[in-house]
Design a protein with these regions (language model features):
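Beta-propeller domain segments
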Residues: 19-29, 136, 153-157, 165, ...
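A short loop-to-beta-strand structural motif that recurs across blades of beta-propeller domains
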Residues: 23, 63-66, 96, 104-106, ...
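A short beta-strand motif characteristic of beta-propeller blades
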Residues: 33-37, 76-81, 122-128, 175-181, ...
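Conserved beta-strand positions in repeat-built beta-propeller and related beta-rich domains
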Residues: 39, 48-49, 55-63, 99-104, ...
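Beta-rich catalytic cores
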Residues: 39-42, 50, 60, 76, ...
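Residue-level detector of Asp-centered blade-edge/turn motifs that repeat once per structural unit
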Residues: 48-52, 92-95, 141-144, 193-196, ...
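Short loop/turn segments immediately following beta-strands, especially the blade-tip
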Residues: 67-72, 108-116, 222-228
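Asp-box/WD-like beta-propeller blade repeats and closely related beta-sheet repeat scaffolds
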Residues: 77, 86, 91, 103-142, ...
Length: 291
C-alpha cells in the first residue's frame, strides 16, 4: 500500500501549481505526496468535520474555507467567512466549527448541514488581547472538552502580564477562561499524547541572540500551572540577555526536545492512524517553517 501525504496549498494561480516541484520533496520509501487542493489561498490550519468537509483557516487573507473532497483531492471549495482579523484557528466539536481571530472566538453551529452556505456565527468570547504581533491563534479541543487557545508574546522579547505568553483554555460556551501554561513565547502547534492524554506543544524562540541560539522547543505539560521560561530563560539553560537576571533557569520547566535555532517549529500532531508503517504510530509529526 502507498502511504499518501496530502499538501493543502495556498496558491493564487494555476501556473504556480504547474511549476510546484513536488519531485524535490524527499519522502520515505512507499510514500507519495500530491496536491490535495490548490484554490485555498494563504491556507494555515485545518479541521475535519464529522460529515467529511475539511475546514481551512488563513492568516493574512482573512478567509475561512470549506472543502468538499473524495478523500484524494478537492472537489469543491467554498469561502464560508471573509474579512476576519487573522482567522488562523479552526476546530470542530459537536458538529460546530469554532474559528479564532486575534481577539475573539466564533462558533458556527451545525455547519455541515448548512453548506455550501454557512450559518450565522455565534460569538463565544472576545476578551483576548488585540495585539497582532504573535496574535494569530492555533486552536484545538483537549480531552477535557475545553478549547485550548494560545496567546503569544506581543514582541520579540518582553515581560507582560497574563494572558500574554501563555496557553489558555476556554469553555465551549465562553463562560470561563483560564491560563494553563506560562512562559510560552509563541506556540502554534500542540496535541495530547494518545495514551497519557498529556499536553505537548512547540514553541518558537526569540530572535537577536545569534544565528545558533536559542533553540526552538518541544515542551511537555502533564499538568496545568507549569512555566516554560520565557522571557527569562530559553531552551532550558540560556539566560535571556535582557531579562535573565530576574529569574534563574532552574526555576522553569526545560524543553523535552530542543530543535535548531529559528527553525520555526509550527504544526505538531501525534500520529494515531493505521496507514503509515507501525514505527510511525504514536510519534509526533512537527512541521518547521524555517528562517
Amino acid at each position: 500500500m502507498t502511504a499518501r501525504l496530502f499538501l493543502a496549498l495556498a496558491l493564487a494561480a494555476a501556473p504556480a501549481l504547474a511549476s510546484l516541484p513536488l519531485e524535490r520533496v524527499k519522502l520515505p520509501p512507499g510514500f507519495e505526496i500530491t496536491v490535495f487542493a490548490a484554490d485555498v489561498k494563504n491556507a494555515r490550519s485545518m479541521a475535519l468535520g464529522e460529515k467529511g468537509w475539511l475546514f481551512v483557516s488563513t492568516r493574512s487573507a482573512g478567509n475561512v474555507y470549506a472543502i468538499r473532497h473524495d478523500g484524494v483531492k478537492a472537489l469543491e471549495t467554498v469561502t464560508i467567512a471573509s474579512g476576519l482579523n487573522m482567522p488562523n484557528g479552526v476546530a470542530m466539536q459537536g458538529g460546530a466549527l469554532f474559528v479564532a481571530e486575534v481577539n475573539r472566538v466564533w462558533r458556527y453551529d451545525a455547519i455541515e448541514a448548512s453548506l455550501p452556505k454557512a450559518p450565522a456565527p455565534v460569538l463565544v468570547y472576545d476578551q483576548y488581547p488585540t495585539d497582532r504581533h504573535h496574535g494569530w491563534k492555533f486552536i484545538r479541543f483537549g480531552p477535557d472538552g475545553w478549547l485550548y487557545v494560545p496567546v503569544g508574546a506581543p514582541c520579540n522579547v518582553c515581560e507582560r502580564e497574563d494572558p500574554y505568553a501563555s496557553i489558555t483554555r476556554l469553555k465551549p460556551d465562553g463562560s470561563a477562561m483560564e491560563v494553563v501554561a506560562r512562559g510560552v513565547r509563541n506556540t502554534v502547534g500542540f496535541d495530547w499524547h494518545p495514551q497519557t492524554k498529556e499536553l505537548w506543544f512547540t514553541d518558537n524562540g526569540r530572535d537577536m541572540m545569534g544565528d545558533d541560539v536559542p533553540p526552538d522547543e518541544l515542551n511537555h505539560a502533564p499538568r496545568p500551572g507549569m512555566h516554560f521560561g520565557f522571557p527569562f530563560c530559553h531552551g532550558g539553560d540560556a539566560a535571556d540577555p535582557d531579562f535573565g537576571r530576574a529569574r534563574r533557569c532552574a526555576e522553569f520547566t526545560p524543553p523535552a526536545q530542543r530543535f535548531g535555532a529559528h527553525v520555526a517549529s509550527l504544526g505538531m500532531r501525534f500520529y494515531t492512524g493505521a496507514m503509515f508503517p507501525p514505527e510511525y504510530r504514536g510519534q509526533a509529526f512537527i512541521a518547521e517553517h524555517g528562517s
